Curated annotation (Swiss-Prot):
Main localization category: membrane
Protein role: Part of the ABC transporter complex HmuTUV involved in hemin import. Responsible for energy coupling to the transport system.
Protein name according to UniProt: Hemin import ATP-binding protein HmuV
PANTHER family to which the protein is assigned, alphabetical: HEMIN IMPORT ATP-BINDING PROTEIN HMUV (PTHR42794:SF1)
Organism (species): Rhodopseudomonas palustris (strain BisA53)
Length: 270
């Protein structure tokens, strides 16, 4: 696999504060990368640099061996799609109209099958004629996810598999739809799309990601396969809380929901 996306000592500073400090990553085509870390660790800032929305103060970000900021807006939009954590829509568009926006200026006739497939994928086919403001927050998030799937599909027809960036995509979703969304992202990765997602649920990250990137205070704390990253010592240090990391029968790590009592620590580490 070729290096699809690369950050080289990428740093972002504003107002004298360094939000992301000298982060280097090499991401292959078709990988699913989960970015995790506590609040204020620099996750969204890093994602925006990788997307081309923010230009690094120092260092570089390259998409397919080319500086990401050198792409013209339309060309960049055809190669990467980003689902932001909060999307504000001022007008009462229908779900169908929102999803169609992912096709840009392409004709409806040329993109209708992509729109239909995306609505079906997110479970909103029966909601396509509903006004977006009448939907719940989670349903609106799913509509915007369908929009970026259409954007990816249109770009793939021109350039091949692209880049999907997700900023806390599950924050407003119930458990079932959290699993559905991340499963869809994983399926995109298996089909060649490079996926980078900020996730707060470490169990989701461990279950679906090929690699987990951990940020702490703007710096890279860890980068590797889930079973190497989701370890008691790292989780305790980065998140400043004691949680019990266990291994499932298939070798995937998972974190128990309850905090570990201090007198259980010796047994846990044994």
């Amino acid at each position: 696999m070729s290096c699809f996306l690369e950050a080289e000592a990428a740093t972002y500073s504003v107002g004298g504060a360094t939000l992301v400090d000298r982060i280097s990553l090499r991401i292959e085509g078709g990988e699913l990368i989960a970015i995790v870390g506590p609040n204020g660790a620099g996750k969204s800032t890093l994602l925006r640099m990788l997307s081309g929305d923010l230009r690094p103060s120092r260092g570089a970000v390259r998409l397919q061996q080319r500086a990401v900021h050198s792409y013209a807006p339309r060309e960049l939009a055809s190669r990467r799609a980003m689902l932001s954590q909060h999307v504000s829509v001022s007008f009462p568009f229908t779900v169908d109209e929102i999803v169609q926006m992912g096709a840009g200026d392409r004709s409806r006739a040329a993109t209708q099958s992509l729109v239909d497939a995306a609505l079906h994928e997110v479970g909103l086919a029966e909601f396509r004629d509903r006004k977006l403001p009448t939907l719940s927050g989670g349903e609106q998030q799913r509509a915007h996810f369908a929009r970026v799937l259409v954007q990816l599909g249109c770009g793939e027809a021109e350039h091949g598999p692209g880049l999907l960036l997700l900023d806390e995509p599950t924050s407003s979703l119930d458990l079932r739809h959290q699993l559905d969304l991340v499963s869809t992202a994983a399926r995109c990765a298996r089909n060649g799309t490079t996926v980078i997602a900020i996730l707060h649920d470490l169990n989701l990250a461990a279950r679906f990601a090929d690699r987990i990137v951990v940020l702490h205070q703007g710096a890279l704390a860890a980068d590797g396969p889930p079973d190497q990253v989701i370890q008691n010592s790292l989780i305790n240090r980065v998140f400043d809380i004691e949680l019990a990391v266990r291994m499932a029968d298939d070798g995937a790590p998972f974190i128990l929901p309850q905090m570990v009592k201090s007198d259980d620590s010796a047994n846990r580490m044994a």
